[in-house]
Amino acid sequence: MAGRGCLELGLFCWVLLAVPVGPQPASSVPGAPLTTLTPPPQSEASMLSLNLGLNFKFHLRGPAAVWGSPVTETHPLSPGLGQESEEDLEGDLRTDPLWELLVGSPGNYVPEWGSAEGSFTPWASSLPPESTSPLSGPTKRPTAPSQPRMSTVTWATALTATAPPTSAPRPRQSELELKFDVALRAGAAPTLGHRSLPLLPSLRASLAEIAGRLGPFGFFGTTLSPLRNFSSQSYQGTTAQPSFASEVSDFPGLFGTTGSLPPPLLERKFSSPSPLDSVASPSSASIKTTPVQHDPTVSTSDPDELSPASFGSPSAQPGCEPGSCSEPELSDDSGQPPASPLPLFFLTLEADWAEARARWGLAWEAHVYGAGALFGLVALLALLSLALLPWRCPPGAPCLALLDLLLLSAGTTRAFPLFYDAYGHRDRLPALAWLLLQDLPLPCLAAGLGLACLLLARPRTPRCPIGLAALLLLGLGLAAAAALGSAVHRPLRPLRLASRGLHAFLAAFLSGLLLALSCWGGRRRRAGAPLGGSGFKGATPVPQVRSPFAPRESWRRAARTAPVAGTFGLLSGALQGYEVLHALGYGGQTGLEGPWPWWAFQLGLRLGEVGVALPLALLGLYPALCSPRVPRRCWAKLFRLSPGHAAPLLPGGWVPGIRDKEPLGSAIARGDAELLQLCALAGPGPDLLLQGGSCPGFEGARANTTQSPASSPSSDCTVDFRPPSPINLRRSIEEALCSEALLAPGLFQGPAFGDALSGLGLYRTISLGNKTGAGPSEKSEKVPGSPAPPELPSPGAWPPGSSASSGSLCGLSRDSSSMLLCSSPDRPPRCPLVCVLSPPRPSESSPSLPASGSYQALSPPSRDSPEHASELQAEEALLQEQFLDACRQIDELSMGSDTIDL
């Protein structure tokens, strides 16, 4: 709709500039508001009137002249000429920035803002400080000389002025003067006695109109309290600067100040008028305006303290009565209702404190202190979560940290103005700071909703995707650019309206998505699958990092905050969207005026934002406080180079001693992954997969036992499984053994971390080469707890309730410094013998055990108590037979080494 309107607008601008036109009269009734959409004839200049389907009207006056050249012209206004339309006076004293963008700037001047829709007299402004302000009124009009001005262009509706017939024409202009009026209305024309509301709302919202309603401090802009409209008196003669409007106009503006202002209510002085920009709220009363330049030395004061000389307006009198000033003011005792509704609740908390306490009582304090305390609580929860994240470091910590930062920003930027602005200390901060304080919380909350959707939707580790990151940067950039542009250049203030609309839409959309995710909780997939089943392809297995809400119970608890945040997010987005529509002329309803609707709307906005921020803060705090599994500390991660931190412990020459013989195919390069040995360190030590070497106490065991050269820890590690060719055979066997039969952490009590690292070595599996001919009867004798041969001492029975039967394939060491391969309890192990290093464990029941750590062989029956050992002897023998058969098949299918040599 907006694009089509702009297209039609440009087309008719071209028609106006290309076609010579003639005059077209229009009739009106003197002394009454304008009741037709056709403006009265203003001069002998030519005029073109086009009445289109939706009542577009364009007026072109003046002979052909050079565009953009300044024109000096004076309009002597006498009581006889005082019946001239206010549109011409408005056109003489206003400049429209939109037309300046269309046809070019006629000179170096600062554009001011036009009147609001339906106001009988617009609050006008002109560049020269010595120019005077016209006094509005349909009956009597004093003479006010107009100073030389630039060529002006206006965009206003025909309903903003009265239309008495002129008795004398103005002098012809020597330059072209273009007046461009647009009125888009539907329905019958209003009657003569009063204005009737259109069937369709006005779409005549130019950039100047919108910018005039955009306060510099947000959607609740630096406007006055609605209490000022409910005074018993109405004071005239207030000065309407670009930053302040004393009385009310007739547009249901979102950023409007309120009606007649009694003197005791304006007690705050603003050092600079530039940070303030207010437009009056609708009323039938007129406004007396005085155009001024942006002068930081001029301060807005009370209505009784107006100085006509300071503003160059001899007619702006503080004590002017309605009769003497010729202003048709509708007072309270006039008995005539206002011409349009007064939506006065789109304002900031800028009422006088004593007056607000008298009007609202406890509700005022609840509004200020209650909402401020809730936003402060949000900031404290976010700060606590940020402090706990480095110590707990749950999965998805970067995403949680970003969520906490956004909530901390939103909470502080909302709590600070509520406490700071209520006492009127706004002049202590620059305008840009206040603009950022008002505009940044909305994109932060919208981005927080997006992160909450990401945390609850992804089953794996949440990572900020490119789309969400771009959306976050776009929202923050648009809000910051709108705030900066509004503080620097006034015509850019409509960007803040676009920013508000975008974030209102995003908040509503993401809130609906969050509600959908909370309802979809029963169908949610499991958060990641455990490792296993295919073996490891690297030297050290990397654990799969899961979502901070991976367990179903944790996800259900976290998802309870989603409906609350989604509901309040929809409420906040709807209210913000209604603000944007109201700024464009929609949504004004009778009965919404007054202090209590204003207070209720403000409180609803604050509660909507708190209802979004507080559940999100609890969502970000839950993984840091209520994580079901204590994760590794982030500080430990900082000192580890990579997940494969144990890889440097497995260099290429991992056997420290001299090998008995060189393995076949040694010229083939081997990676570190192939050097992963099939032994684990038992006990609570580091559980690291260490490289070869001697073991403290193992020499004593070697002295008492006779081991084969193959089973020596310093001998060749591959003598038992050396095939005719080394093509993938070593890796195949290691994968087969590592995937099922390694032990879980914490199965035996072992030395401390420092003691274990001193001399522990890495050993290999028990040599099976000398057992190929052994029958099941021979192998069945090796039962835990029974007297064992010296070379294979039994570790004894595992205590009941130990973690031998639990754990996953991949686990953590006891000091959380490494990864350990764990056994799979639900499958029978495929490797019957796994070598471990047990700690010194003196035991009377097993005198064959050495006094220190020994090289032991664990068999599957050792998982159970000795009572069940006899039942598992046959199973152990069968497993060993299957293992040896698999080794023989591998040897048969392997390629000969002589082929490789060729």
Curated annotation (Swiss-Prot):
Entry-linked InterPro entries: PRRT_domain-containing (IPR052836)
Membrane topology: Multi-pass membrane protein
Location of Phosphoserine modifications: 642
Keyword Phosphoprotein: yes
GO cellular component, one term: membrane
Region (Disordered): 120-149, 262-337, 700-721, 771-811, 836-872
The keyword 4Fe-4S is annotated on this UniProt entry: no
Transmembrane segments: 371-391, 393-413, 431-451, 465-485, 501-521
Keywords: Membrane, Phosphoprotein, Signal, Transmembrane, Transmembrane helix
Organism: Rattus norvegicus (Rat)
Bias-annotated ranges (Low complexity): 125-139, 799-811, 843-854
Subcellular location: Membrane
Protein name: Proline-rich transmembrane protein 4
Bias kind Polar residues: ranges: 271-301, 703-717
Biased composition regions of type Pro residues, renumbered to the chain: 786-798
Annotated signal peptide: 1-18
